[in-house]
Amino acid sequence: MCEQLARLHGCNILIIGDNDCLVNKYGHSVTIACGYDPQGMSVRILKEGGGGGGGGGGGQQLEEYPVNAKTTHLNHGHTSHVVVAGGEMLYLKFASKADCQLFRSLLQKMSGKVNSVFNLRTEDSSASQYFQFYGYLSQQQNMMQDFVRTSTYQRAIYSNSQDFHNKIVLDVGAGSGILSFFAVQAGAAKVYAVEASNMAQYAQQLVHSNNLNGKITVIAGKIEEIELPEMVDVIISEPMGYMLYNERMLETYLHGKKWLKPEGKMFPSRGDLHVAPFTDEALYMEQYNKANFWMQSEFHGVNLVSLRDAAMKEYFRQPIVDTFDIRICMAKSIRHTTNFLTADEKDLHRIQIDVEFHILETGTCHGLAFWFDVEFAGSCSQIWLSTAPTESLTHWYQVRCLLQTPIFVKQGQVLSGKVVLAANQRQSYDVEIDLKLEGTMITSCNTLDLKNPYFRYTGAPVPAPPGSNTTSPSEAYWGQLDAQGARNAVNLVNGITVNGLGEVDMSIINSNMMPMGNQPNIHPGLISSTGRQQSAQQQVTPSQQLTMNPTIACAATSTQNVAQQQLIGGAISPSLFTTPTQQIINSHHAQPIHGGQFY
């Protein structure tokens, strides 16, 4: 671990033997290494001496025991302590009274954490799963490769460098430490990077390899439980989850304000959750038809019908995580703002959003759509990070909550009600929706479990909602081709290309290359702005594909395959934006045609 709490040499581990007498478990003295663990403390048993053994020096690791606030232990004399771990009772005999007292102080400190703010609001199983998830490098990579997320944070910090120059900075939930590095690059004098998962050890490794040990101090622990040696000028963090509040990391971010100096800065400074009614018959029927599986009365001779109602309720309790065309929204979004500088963490235990939507078009309201924006209000500039469906897609996507009973609404009507986000101990929220169509008796409500969303995003371009075309798409397409053909009209004279002026075009004589437009090296099915389609001049015709070297895949196909391999949880590998596309004709004379640069 990156934070070693204690290393105690010359210890003996005794257990009860077959004859009910204490015997040395390993037959020799050992070193007890105590280190940080998200759930308490890790006790590693090492061979005495040697140079290996899992970091920090010491001998070979013989065993490791997790010790937490629920672990049974008791004092045994001045130099011994009894711990029940690994399914057996261990008698730890230390080399000195001082070592024994140090070990007991660590246990006492750990036991005091059982009543920390975080532990009181979080189930043990949820916390364990949460910290394990964020302890994986692959998950950190997923977030870091979200270009919009990472680059917006970088710009917000760089463009407000005077807020960081020679300042003390706290990075809450530092993860890999990327924001801490940005702060140092902006001139921070000192950064305390606090990370509760085992990712802290990797963050420390990055700090060391980048020669920033004097600038960045990695602290392994929860912000609710650790102590800082000084107050800070700025707090930075990336605490947002789905629908802004999921994972309840925002409460941890706000808790960190106990270390913030008066008039200190917070990056981000505020968060806006947007809520809008939407119509999407296809999505509704998709969930509805899943539940209809249980309508079968003869499934391998078994009648499933009695479970259909329970299945329907379960499917409609799932928030949908994907993206959509904003034109499916039936009214202007309602904005709920949380000012991180003034809000208290208790304000996020129950969030009520009163809504009143003035319907802009007639149709069926199938539920409510959610997205968020956050602001970085610095001294020099204000930068916004948006997850709106009109903006480039991020790993937060957007979230939609369906009504099991949709509401038919007409243009000009008012749809009112409330949305309540009730925090639970699973680090998430129960989303309660209650809507009424004003002037009628029509109502609809639903309760959804934000901890159990349905990840629906497939990478395919988002289609426009039905009925969006106001002119004939067919005529528009052929008209565009006709106009392009008129501009590029050519004639063939004895097999030689001649332009519209009657002059021989020498540019493609003795060339087997097929002229085609530059193609940016990004597949339209990846994270792109909502509803954008691949342009006509970027398509590869079947005849072009047939003439290409079969050993070299054409870009329209190969980019897609590479994308599928490099798309990790919603983030795109940077190589997709840097590797040039090549179209090669089946001829030894052919030269590659490079795709256009993507900006």
Swiss-Prot record:
<dbReference type="InterPro" id="IPR025799">
    <property type="entry name" value="Arg_MeTrfase"/>
</dbReference>
<dbReference type="Pfam" id="PF06325">
    <property type="entry name" value="PrmA"/>
</dbReference>
<keyword id="KW-0963">Cytoplasm</keyword>
<keyword id="KW-0488">Methylation</keyword>
<feature type="binding site">
    <location>
        <position position="149"/>
    </location>
    <ligand>
        <name>S-adenosyl-L-methionine</name>
    </ligand>
</feature>
<feature type="domain" description="SAM-dependent MTase PRMT-type">
    <location>
        <begin position="127"/>
        <end position="434"/>
    </location>
</feature>
<keyword id="KW-0808">Transferase</keyword>
<feature type="binding site">
    <location>
        <position position="140"/>
    </location>
    <ligand>
        <name>S-adenosyl-L-methionine</name>
    </ligand>
</feature>
<dbReference type="GO" id="GO:0035241">
    <property type="term" value="F:protein-arginine omega-N monomethyltransferase activity"/>
</dbReference>
<keyword id="KW-0489">Methyltransferase</keyword>
<dbReference type="GO" id="GO:0006338">
    <property type="term" value="P:chromatin remodeling"/>
</dbReference>
<keyword id="KW-0805">Transcription regulation</keyword>
<comment type="similarity">
    <text>Belongs to the class I-like SAM-binding methyltransferase superfamily. Protein arginine N-methyltransferase family.</text>
</comment>
<feature type="binding site">
    <location>
        <position position="195"/>
    </location>
    <ligand>
        <name>S-adenosyl-L-methionine</name>
    </ligand>
</feature>
<protein>
    <recommendedName>
        <fullName>Histone-arginine methyltransferase CARMER</fullName>
        <ecNumber>2.1.1.319</ecNumber>
    </recommendedName>
</protein>
<dbReference type="GO" id="GO:0019919">
    <property type="term" value="P:peptidyl-arginine methylation, to asymmetrical-dimethyl arginine"/>
</dbReference>
<dbReference type="GO" id="GO:0035642">
    <property type="term" value="F:histone H3R17 methyltransferase activity"/>
</dbReference>
<feature type="binding site">
    <location>
        <position position="252"/>
    </location>
    <ligand>
        <name>S-adenosyl-L-methionine</name>
    </ligand>
</feature>
<dbReference type="GO" id="GO:0006355">
    <property type="term" value="P:regulation of DNA-templated transcription"/>
</dbReference>
<comment type="function">
    <text>Methylates (mono- and asymmetric dimethylation) the guanidino nitrogens of arginyl residues in proteins. May methylate histone H3 at 'Arg-17' and activate transcription via chromatin remodeling.</text>
</comment>
<keyword id="KW-0156">Chromatin regulator</keyword>
<dbReference type="GO" id="GO:0140903">
    <property type="term" value="F:histone H3R26 methyltransferase activity"/>
</dbReference>
<dbReference type="InterPro" id="IPR029063">
    <property type="entry name" value="SAM-dependent_MTases_sf"/>
</dbReference>
<dbReference type="GO" id="GO:0005737">
    <property type="term" value="C:cytoplasm"/>
</dbReference>
<keyword id="KW-0539">Nucleus</keyword>
<dbReference type="GO" id="GO:0035242">
    <property type="term" value="F:protein-arginine omega-N asymmetric methyltransferase activity"/>
</dbReference>
<keyword id="KW-0949">S-adenosyl-L-methionine</keyword>
<dbReference type="Pfam" id="PF22528">
    <property type="entry name" value="PRMT_C"/>
</dbReference>
<keyword id="KW-0804">Transcription</keyword>
<feature type="modified residue" description="Asymmetric dimethylarginine; by autocatalysis">
    <location>
        <position position="487"/>
    </location>
</feature>
<dbReference type="GO" id="GO:0005634">
    <property type="term" value="C:nucleus"/>
</dbReference>
<comment type="subunit">
    <text>Homodimer.</text>
</comment>
<dbReference type="InterPro" id="IPR055135">
    <property type="entry name" value="PRMT_dom"/>
</dbReference>
<dbReference type="GO" id="GO:0070611">
    <property type="term" value="F:histone H3R2 methyltransferase activity"/>
</dbReference>
<feature type="binding site">
    <location>
        <position position="224"/>
    </location>
    <ligand>
        <name>S-adenosyl-L-methionine</name>
    </ligand>
</feature>
<feature type="binding site">
    <location>
        <position position="173"/>
    </location>
    <ligand>
        <name>S-adenosyl-L-methionine</name>
    </ligand>
</feature>
